[in-house]
């Protein structure tokens, strides 16, 4: 029943916007763009990812949404027709959530859309965008993002806010990440930042 309500809500939202599906966009920050202090202010516990994405899709420009929050990155994946309006709305959400000002937040963010957004997430899931290249945790974290994003409502969390576009995109990058790890040697060496630190200390 919960899954049916979720589907009806999404269909109603798309109907109100002319029934057209938007295209993907990612807004976020990482160890490459932001300090630990800024990343910590944006961090969201995994148990609250769906609550955050539910708030995001309340914005009129956003059709679908998913959140990925780790120690080294915070990324919001959305689907929208008007990427300018979507960027404005996601930025508003990030300001409210973090309590950071425009000047504190804006310089740390990156924005990618359409094919660039997909390629970015492929690099993330494969471990190519990690602090330690090929580290093993990130694929599990992207898988968790996908699982939450497509989940039905439960006693523990709201339903995910991914629809056709984000659902397919997240599933595809998880499959690609698995393929990269099984068919290449990228996973050799340190599997995480902590293990890399241990190796350097020995």
Q: Model features per residue range: what roles?
A:
Residues 1-18:
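N-terminal mitochondrial targeting presequence
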Residues 104-202:
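Glycine/serine-rich phosphate-binding loop and adjoining beta1-alpha1 elements at the start
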Residues 15-130:
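A glycine-rich (often HGG/GG-containing) alpha/beta subdomain
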